[in-house]
């Protein structure tokens, strides 16, 4: 079979297994570091005896979501971490697998793999928390619960746009579309760091963040110099068009259009990342921009 033409899940599994085995020590240190971050959150909120049980779980859920969001973005920029040296690039590029299989392997590692690692690391921190609880005297009842299960359950419920609360059932469709739109924007933001990780060498996270900040500043400066003092009646045609088509031109339509646009941007970033990956060389040019 020609490995340059056909996608094979068996080869993909072998590439992922090889990547995991060769980097087991780095993965272990990463896992322990993430566990320590979650353990610090547990210990911090164990000293807080005020507030209700719901507040206690909400605080943990907020901290878990913040840590997870940062880690997923950071490790997205580390997509090509296993190809930073000439020896690593030679070893990875010479694997008997297609470029797509190698790219998908790394993509799964920094997305699904990292999320699973975060879940397990937070679970380990929960186990350690329970192990140290006997050393604390007279702990309130709100601390004697499985915080890991309740906190992650709340996060998943909040991220699920189809589980609208009772006060949002009046316009549930708009709430669902708004949630999907927000998730699409988050995927687009994540894809920017996937793209940055495939383009930059070292310090991809900081370089990508710096470019995003620079572009935001330039856009803000450009917008500030635009004269928005339009004459009367400039947008009358737009107002009339919206009133004549209000049966379909509503917030649901706008949310759907925005979702589609960001999905296109996300797909383009992933496609461009793959194209950059296929152009990886064992010996990189000496003079390379950034």
Model-derived features: positions:
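Hydrophobic alpha-helical transmembrane segments of membrane proteins
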Residues: 1-90, 99-290
């Amino acid at each position: 079979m020609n490995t340059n033409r056909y996608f094979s899940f068996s080869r993909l599994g072998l590439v992922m297994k090889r990547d995991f085995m060769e980097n087991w020590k780095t993965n272990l240190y990463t896992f322990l570091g993430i566990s320590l971050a979650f353990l610090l959150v547990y210990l911090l909120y164990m000293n807080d005896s005020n507030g209700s049980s719901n507040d206690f779980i909400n605080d943990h859920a907020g901290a878990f979501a913040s840590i997870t969001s940062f880690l997923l973005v950071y490790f997205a920029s580390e997509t090509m971490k296993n190809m930073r040296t000439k020896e690593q690039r030679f070893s990875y590029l010479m694997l008997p697998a297609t470029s797509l299989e190698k790219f998908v392997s790394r993509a799964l590692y920094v997305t699904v793999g990292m999320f699973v690692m975060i879940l397990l690391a937070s679970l380990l921190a929960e186990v350690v928390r329970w192990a140290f609880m006997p050393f604390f005297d007279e702990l309130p009842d709100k601390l004697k619960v499985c915080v890991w299960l309740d906190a992650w359950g709340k996060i998943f419920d909040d991220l699920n746009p189809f589980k609208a609360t009772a006060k949002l059932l009046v316009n549930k469709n708009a709430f669902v579309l708004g949630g999907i739109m927000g998730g699409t924007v988050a995927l687009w933001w994540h894809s920017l760091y996937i793209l940055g990780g495939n383009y930059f060498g070292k310090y991809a996270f900081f370089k990508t963040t710096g470019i995003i900040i620079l572009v935001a500043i330039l856009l803000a400066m450009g917008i500030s110099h635009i004269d928005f003092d339009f004459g009367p009646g400039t947008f009358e045609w737009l107002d009339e068009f919206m009133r004549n088509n209000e049966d379909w031109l509503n917030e649901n339509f706008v949310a759907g259009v925005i979702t589609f646009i960001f999905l296109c941007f996300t797909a383009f970033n992933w496609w461009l990342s793959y194209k950059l990956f296929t152009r990886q060389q064992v010996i990189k040019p000496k003079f390379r921009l950034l």
